[in-house]
Swiss-Prot record:
Belongs to the RimP family. PANTHER family: RIBOSOME MATURATION FACTOR RIMP (PTHR33867:SF1). NCBIfam families: PRK00092.2-1, PRK14642.1. This is Ribosome maturation factor RimP. It is found in: Cytoplasm. One of its GO terms (cellular component) is cytosol. Keywords: Cytoplasm, Ribosome biogenesis. Required for maturation of 30S ribosomal subunits. The gene is rimP. InterPro entries: Ribosome_maturation_RimP, RimP_C, RimP_C_sf, RimP_N, RimP_N_sf. HAMAP family: RimP. Its main location: cytoplasm.
């Protein structure tokens, strides 16, 4: 049985979602897991719940089970590392994009924009950061503004025209990689729309 298949079956059997498998030099086998996402329904969104995250105990449970499974299958590795996806989580399928709709993401295209850029962005550009949205065509798009960030204490002229919003539509087949943008706000976590204040 292939490594991907062994790990997927083991992780799914324990009730988790496999995010990524990475083999590194020195025999390191790194497995990234997350909780299975259930799309919100009226009943679920009506219930006031706390967002849940992967804990150390979850990683320990998966590690113990994977050690047995990998030994039985004869997979060669020196060290096994099981972790949560972190703030720059990989987005790999349609369900991940639905789950993180409205979040800021970083995408890398397989091919540069080329003539499709239409002079709006550099034709050789492949990396973009923006807010993930569902496109009118049914695919996905990211929306961003090239407005420079405002520095603390900086005054903004009332005459200054804001930079226009730009959008880039894409399909999952056109992506080399998509990840949540690692944005950390040290001022505290604000409430999301619909959450109790």
């Amino acid at each position: 049985m292939a490594l991907q298949q062994i790990v997927e079956q083991t992780v799914a059997g324990l009730g988790y979602d496999l995010v990524e498998i990475e083999r590194s030099a020195g025999g390191l086998l790194r497995i990234t897991i997350d909780l299975v996402w259930v799309p919100p329904t009226d009943e679920v969104s009506a219930a006031v719940g706390v967002e849940q995250f992967i804990t150390v105990e979850d990683c320990e449970k998966v590690t113990r089970q994977l050690q047995f499974a990998l030994e039985v299958e004869g997979v060669d590795y020196t060290r096994l590392e099981v972790s949560s996806p972190g703030i720059d989580r990989l987005l790999r399928n349609e369900a991940d994009f639905k789950r993180f709709e409205g979040e800021v993401i970083d995408i890398t295209l397989k091919q540069p924009m080329g003539a499709a850029a239409g002079g709006q962005v550099h034709a050789n550009r492949k990396k973009f950061r923006g807010t993930l949205e569902r496109a009118d065509s049914g695919g996905w798009q990211i929306v961003w503004s090239d407005e420079p960030p405002v520095k603390p204490g900086q005054r903004i002229s009332k005459k200054r025209v804001p930079a226009p919003l730009q959008a880039l539509g894409f399909t999952l087949d056109e992506l080399r990689e998509a990840r949540l943008a690692p944005i950390v706000d040290f001022k505290g976590r604000g409430t999301k729309p619909g959450e109790p204040g």
